[in-house]
């Protein structure tokens, strides 16, 4: 099954198991306000959009999803022929791992001018990255400033570990949440104290 055991009762096939008519299925889906799943799962269950129209779709790790993989959701229509999803919120970090693409940079390069005119220069780029590149190029415009924002509080890295990526990639804007594992002296493994990387890490 596709989730942790405590949540398996909430899988859609289990939620709908007791329904005996289409009307019951429709009513149960209509009552549910939040649906969680992968892009691939939702793209393969297009019948869902005939039963329910969604106000917003939040796509996490959007920088690791190529545009064709999102196409089914972007184009989803309800029974009235309107957009089945009213708005998309893409969450990701274009400075971390990109989508996995086997082709080389030159093989995935886009040469058509009509595609380049909308910011599509390489097929390995995610929709997130293309849109971010477009709006950040016009960052002085009051309109485009409303399209994106940056989450500045991180709860993952120890404050010492975070110093380098914070300065090198995020302009010093990252702030630690202050969780227990982020605090305290960073203890290096035996043998690393004299390592050049360790010296750089400690000195910075």
Residues covered by each model-derived region:
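Conserved helicase NTPase catalytic core signature
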Residues: 1-55, 69
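Conserved helicase motor core of SF1/SF2 NTP-dependent helicases
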Residues: 26, 40-42, 48-204
């Amino acid at each position: 099954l596709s989730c942790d055991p405590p949540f398996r009762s909430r899988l859609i096939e289990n939620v709908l198991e007791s329904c005996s008519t289409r009307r019951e299925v429709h009513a149960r889906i209509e009552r549910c306000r939040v649906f969680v799943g992968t892009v691939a799962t939702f793209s393969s269950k297009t019948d869902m959009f005939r039963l329910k129209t969604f106000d917003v779709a939040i796509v996490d790790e959007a920088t690791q999803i190529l545009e064709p993989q999102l196409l089914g959701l972007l184009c989803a229509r309800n029974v009235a022929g309107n957009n089945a999803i009213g708005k998309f919120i893409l969450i990701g970090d274009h400075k971390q791992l990109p989508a996995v693409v086997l082709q080389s940079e030159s093989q995935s390069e886009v040469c058509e001018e009509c595609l380049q005119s909308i910011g599509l220069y390489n097929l390995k780029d995610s929709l997130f990255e293309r849109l971010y590149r477009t709006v950040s190029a016009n960052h002085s415009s009051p309109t485009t400033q409303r399209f994106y924002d940056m989450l500045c509080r991180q709860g993952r890295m120890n404050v010492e570990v975070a110093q380098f990526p914070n300065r090198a990639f995020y302009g010093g804007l990252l702030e630690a949440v202050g969780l227990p594992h982020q605090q305290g002296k960073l203890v290096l493994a035996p043998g690393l104290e004299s390592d050049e990387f360790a010296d750089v890490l400690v000195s910075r």
